[in-house]
């Protein structure tokens, strides 16, 4: 098990981010010591965190990631995000064309 500080370093996120993910139900600690309040995470959760970070980098919102993790309409959510990215790409390409 990892304490939150070590887990945040391995996951390359801030402790504040982990607290937020806990608050919104995205990634809860595996164990919280009742005496100290220390939060502990497992190595399996590190994989989950990497997945969450990757989805955030692609531009998914926390609510979308919650839906993906829950398994609801995953294909539809991914398809919609792909369409959004393609549209953004086209807009940027058009702007670059105008600059030339």
Where are each of the predicted segments found?
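Basic helix-turn-helix/winged-helix DNA-binding cores
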Residues: 1-62
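Short, charged amphipathic alpha-helical surface segments
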Residues: 53, 58, 66-100
């Amino acid at each position: 098990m990892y304490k939150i500080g070590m887990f945040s370093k391995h996951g390359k996120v801030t402790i504040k981010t982990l607290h937020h993910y806990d608050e919104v139900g995205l990634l809860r600690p595996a164990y919280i010591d009742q005496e100290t309040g220390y939060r502990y995470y497992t190595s399996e959760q590190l994989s989950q965190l990497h997945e969450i970070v990757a989805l955030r980098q692609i531009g998914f919102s926390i609510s979308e990631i919650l839906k993906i993790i829950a398994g609801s309409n995953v294909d539809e959510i991914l398809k919609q995000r792909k369409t959004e990215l393609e549209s953004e790409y086209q807009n940027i390409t058009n702007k670059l064309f105008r600059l030339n």
